[in-house]
Regions:
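Hydrophobic/small/kink-forming positions within alpha-helical transmembrane segments
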Residues: 2-6, 10, 32-37, 63, ...
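Specific transmembrane alpha-helical segments of multi-pass solute transporters/efflux pumps
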Residues: 1-28, 64, 147-165
């Protein structure tokens, strides 16, 4: 809870005040590679050439989609915060994979994780945040959406997949973040899809296929 909800999400939110969101997506997409590397360092886990190739192919697909969307200069502080957040979620992923969690208790674990993260952030927010909230429909919808999807549904799926398919194969699905981002932008915001976007999506799918064809896993 402290690592994932407190450090990772807290650092990413801070980073987004300093850098373009597209840059943060590119950095976050390195997660499968950092998980694979630290799994090898700490647990001597190995990924086959096929699986490793899939990770790099997926990352190339992400770059094809996102690099064209980086429009403004970025601050070194924002990059640093984003990398720290990446490392936090890397270690959180490895810890969850290795500890024994009963699948029937996942909701309880998610609740405790959110509680631990909120207790960690509460004193920090008291001293460093402005306690002023404008209660309106936009705030209410945003709050409920974040609580339901990133707060509850996402972590439940996160815990389940890590126990079922392993850390590296699970983290490889982070490559789909830019895909869903451009899909939502296209259908809801009317943004234009480029040829590079379509090629990037195809490359990401190939990368995911290669990773999940790897029988060794982690």
């Amino acid at each position: 809870g402290v690592i994932q909800n407190g450090l990772y999400l807290g650092l990413i939110f801070l980073a987004l005040t300093k850098i373009d969101s597209n840059v943060s997506v590119i950095i976050a997409s390195i997660l499968p590679l950092t998980v694979a590397f630290f799994s090898w360092v700490f647990f001597k886990s190995r990924l086959s050439l096929l699986g490793l190739s899939g990770l790099f192919v997926g990352l190339i697909g992400v770059l094809l989609i996102m690099i064209q969307r980086v429009e403004k200069e970025y601050e070194i502080l924002g990059i640093t915060l984003c990398i720290m957040g990446l490392l936090a979620t890397t270690f959180s992923t490895l810890i969850i994979t290795k500890i024994n969690i009963n699948k029937n208790n996942i909701l309880i674990v998610v609740g405790l994780q959110m509680l631990a993260g909120s207790l960690f952030l509460l004193p920090l927010s008291y001293f460093f945040e402005v306690w002023s909230i404008s209660f309106n429909m936009t705030f209410l919808f945003t709050f409920l959406y974040i609580a339901a999807f990133p707060g509850i549904i996402g972590p439940v799926i996160w815990f389940y997949l890590q126990k079922e398919i392993g850390a590296v194969k699970y983290s490889s699905f982070h490559f789909l973040v830019p895909f869903f981002g451009i899909a939502i932008s296209y259908f809801l915001l009317g943004e234009t899809l480029t040829f590079s976007d379509m090629i990037g999506v195809i490359v990401i799918i190939i990368g995911l296929y290669l990773v999940n064809r790897d029988k060794k896993g982690f």
